[in-house]
Amino acid sequence: MKFNTIDEFLKHYVDLNYRYDILYLNDKEMYKDLFEYAYARKMNAIYQSLLGYLYKYGEGVEKSETSSFEWFYKAASNGHGYAMYELGLIYVKGRCVQQDLNQAFSWYSKSSELGVDAAMNNLGLFYEKGIACTRNMEHAFALYLKAAEKGNKSAITNVALCYRTGNGVPLDYNKSFYWYQIGAEKGDSVALNSLGYMYENGYGCNKSLEQAFNYYLQAAEKGLARAMNNVGFFYDRGMSVPQDYKKALYWYEKAAEKGEIYAMRNVGLFYKDGLGTSVDLNKAKYWFTKAGEAGHPSAMVHLGYMYEKGNGVVQDYKTALEWYLKAAKLGNAVALSNIGVYYEKGYG
């Protein structure tokens, strides 16, 4: 939301519960005036929080994590819920202060008590993971649900996931589907992708690969890497769309460049086998290595095989065995079989 005046900006800053990240001034020079306006009212918690954001993003003033923390702390000490949430984030990340998860838990708790949905969601994560507290999945779900009912996108997908997996609440695909729909209607990429998963598997709905592809594509176009990989897979296998290796590779590469581990392996396979492109063993090795280093066992096996046979690399039994061993530790059956052959023949 963009505004032409400071008064409009400040009105929406309060009305939208201090969501500074979605508010903008059309004229960048006006941020200096906004800073001066807020600084002149620095004894008020609302303006203390605003100064925290201005220092955080370096708008109207030189960016300073330390100054941002100081102003958020003043605002939080004066009862500002969103400033408390920001302090929680700072203590989690350990930016300009030493990381302190106990402090983060404390500030998230205080912020949650004041109804800040983002803090509720993050506090739910702490309870789910047992961070700075005893793990309590039921309490985590309750916090997710409160935040979701306030419209928090992350919490909405967390509630849906809890229902989908039966984590902290009885498994219920219908309720999971319901919450994913709400998230998708808000344009949340994770919810869109997850709704695609529900349609692909017929969870809480009639199975529809066409609908699944549609939601995967929407999420992919919003930049979600795992959705890009899913779109690539549908083109790869010809699921509800004509098989098209070029389109599959296009989406796999977009996902791989974002660090999606399965996409990295898939790109490696496409370059190894010349699917949608010409064979390029150098690129195959590059992507298998990226995926292998990220922990994908199948990519480790493919990379090991390249070294074993000298495909695109200098033949090296020792390096091949190292990759097979890494994959075997992750339970890959092919790697275990290959290691058996290695020891039998004395390779490596």
Role assignments for model-derived ranges:
Residues 40-48, 57-59, 64, 77-81, ...:
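Short helix-capping/linker turns of helical repeat alpha-solenoids
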Residues 37, 74-75, 110-111, 146-147, ...:
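Canonical positions in the second alpha-helix
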Residues 48-57, 84-93, 120-129, 133, ...:
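Hydrophobic face of amphipathic alpha-helices that form TPR/SEL1-like repeat modules
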Residues 27-59, 70-77, 86:
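Alpha-solenoid helical-repeat scaffolds
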Residues 7-10, 35, 145, 196, ...:
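Residue-level detector of alpha-helical secondary structure
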Residues 1-39:
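N-terminal alpha-helical interaction modules that lie
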